[in-house]
Amino acid sequence: MTTGKLILLRHGQSEWNASNQFTGWVDVNLTEKGEAEAKRGGELLKAQGVLPSVVYTSLLRRAIRTANIALNAADRHWIPVVRDWRLNERHYGALQGLNKAETKEKYGDEQFMAWRRSYGTPPPELEDSSEFSQANDPRYANLDVVPRTECLKDVVERFVPYFKEEILPRVKNGETVLIAAHGNSLRALVKHLDNISDADIAELNIPTGIPLVYELDEAGTVLNPGGTYLDPEAAAAGAAAVAAQGAK
């Protein structure tokens, strides 16, 4: 039986992760801690012999740099890299740039969690005149419509079809594929891989910088539901930290 591997790696801590701001499509960089997390992720891949033959990432530098740093640490810096906007983080609309704790205090827990974790409730749209808008960003010039806001359902609808068409066939063929992306684009994919309900996906948190490995057979069936973190203890602590965002 042919078995392929799918490695999911959320980018290391970004500048706005550190300052507790909604980031979305704003192209912020990694912090020094984020760079170290990305390196550690690559070292885990090398140490456990999970070596990708290709990497897919977004058009945002925090994911691109995470991929590059991790691949360098794993001695896989030479493999092909595919960048696509459909792996981008969820667009957080008018929340982009806002502090999470201040937003929670202003709008209340229920509205805050609906925007942040519900499956189908997008935040208010971002105006094209905002400094955080991507309306005139050249990397999205070929899109018919540049998103002004998204909910997780929107991310599923843009990313999962791309995954099925472009990435899944390689995994089914026995390749090991690395996806270096974002909290919500990876949540969208895990929802699909593990058949998580629209309600239950609200409870899923993806930690930064810790590889999550799925094994799939040639039919595309997941052989280890839920995946396997290469550092389970660090993953549990990291997921708890993500869940706590907005509380401080």
Curated annotation (Swiss-Prot):
Is Cell inner membrane included in the keywords of this UniProt record?
A: no
Q: What is its EC number?
A: 5.4.2.11
- Give any single GO term for biological process: gluconeogenesis
Enzymatic reactions: (2R)-2-phosphoglycerate = (2R)-3-phosphoglycerate
Q: Where is this site: Transition state stabilizer?
A: 182
A Pfam family of this chain: His_Phos_1
* Primary enzyme class: isomerase
Q: What task does this protein carry out?
A: Catalyzes the interconversion of 2-phosphoglycerate and 3-phosphoglycerate.
Fetch the PANTHER family from UniProt. PHOSPHOGLYCERATE MUTASE (PTHR11931)
Looking up NCBIfam families in the UniProt record yields:
pgm_1, PRK14115.1, PRK14120.1
Extract the HAMAP family matched here: PGAM_GpmA (MF_01039)
User: What is the official name of this protein in its record?
Assistant: 2,3-bisphosphoglycerate-dependent phosphoglycerate mutase
Upper classification of the source organism reads: Bacteria, Bacillati, Actinomycetota, Actinomycetes, Mycobacteriales
| Gene this chain is encoded by | gpmA
